[in-house]
C-alpha cells in the first residue's frame, strides 16, 4: 500500500514538474543570439502592449517594453522594414522573443474556445525560440498605425489570414505585409495576420530568459495610435 501511495504521488507530481519550465527537446540547436531590434534600426517602432495593461490579460507581463529576435531573423526583419519604406510604410513591433513563462501565463488565462490564438506551453512557442514576430504597419507620412481590419490580439475570425470581409485598403495592406515578410523568410500564422515565424525556427531552443537579463534597454520611437 505504501508503494502504491508513493507511485500515485509521483504521478501527480510529474505534470507539475513538466510545467515548471520549457519542455526538454532532443537534438542539437544553435546557440541563442538574441538581438534587440532597435539596436539594428531605431526607426522600427515598438508598441509592446504586454509591458502595459492594454492587452488581452489586462495586466503587464513584461517589466520592460523591448523586442528581440535571433540575429538572422532580426537582420531579415530590418530588410523588410527598409523595403516597405519604398511603399510609404514602416514596421511597428508588438512582440518578438517571449519567455516561456509568459506563454504559460497566456495559456492558463485563455478560454478553451480561444486557445487557437495562444501556444500550448507543453510544446512551447516559436516566440520562445526568438523566431516569431507580431507586428503591423505604420504610415511614414503621418506616423499613425495602418488600419489592418482587425486589432492586435483580436480573437475573432477577422484576424484570420483568409478573412475577406475588410475593405480593399485593409486587405491590400495585409497582402503587402505578407509579401514583404515572405520574401525575407517569414511565414504568416493562418489565424493571426500580425504573427510571422522565421524559416529557421526549428534550429533554436525554447528559452525562458526574462528581458532584464538580456542587457541594457535600447531606446526606440513610440508608436502613435491609428
Language-model features: locations:
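Extracytoplasmic cell-surface/polysaccharide-interacting catalytic and binding patches
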Residues: 18-96, 106-191, 200-226
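Conserved metal-phosphate-binding beta-hairpin within the catalytic cores
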Residues: 196
Amino acid at each position: 500500500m505504501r508503494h502504491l501511495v508513493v507511485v500515485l504521488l509521483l504521478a501527480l507530481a510529474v505534470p507539475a514538474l513538466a510545467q515548471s519550465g520549457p519542455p526538454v527537446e532532443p537534438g542539437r540547436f544553435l546557440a541563442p543570439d538574441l538581438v534587440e531590434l532597435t539596436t539594428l534600426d531605431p526607426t522600427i517602432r515598438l508598441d509592446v502592449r504586454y509591458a502595459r495593461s492594454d492587452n488581452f490579460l489586462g495586466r503587464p507581463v513584461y517589466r520592460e517594453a523591448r523586442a528581440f529576435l535571433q540575429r538572422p531573423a532580426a537582420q531579415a526583419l530590418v530588410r523588410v522594414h527598409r523595403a516597405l519604406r519604398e511603399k510609404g510604410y514602416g514596421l511597428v513591433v508588438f512582440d518578438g522573443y517571449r519567455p516561456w513563462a509568459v506563454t504559460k501565463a497566456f495559456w492558463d488565462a485563455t478560454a478553451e474556445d480561444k486557445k487557437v490564438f495562444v501556444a500550448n506551453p507543453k510544446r512551447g512557442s516559436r516566440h520562445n525560440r526568438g523566431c516569431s514576430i507580431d507586428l503591423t504597419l505604420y504610415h511614414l507620412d503621418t506616423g499613425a498605425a495602418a488600419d489592418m481590419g482587425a486589432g492586435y490580439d483580436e480573437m475573432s475570425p477577422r484576424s484570420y489570414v483568409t478573412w475577406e470581409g475588410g475593405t480593399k485598403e485593409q486587405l491590400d495592406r495585409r497582402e503587402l505585409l505578407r509579401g514583404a515578410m515572405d520574401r525575407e523568410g517569414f511565414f504568416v500564422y493562418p489565424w493571426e495576420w500580425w504573427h510571422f515565424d522565421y524559416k529557421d525556427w526549428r534550429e533554436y531552443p525554447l528559452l525562458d530568459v526574462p528581458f532584464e537579463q538580456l542587457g541594457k534597454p535600447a531606446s526606440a520611437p513610440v508608436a502613435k495610435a491609428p
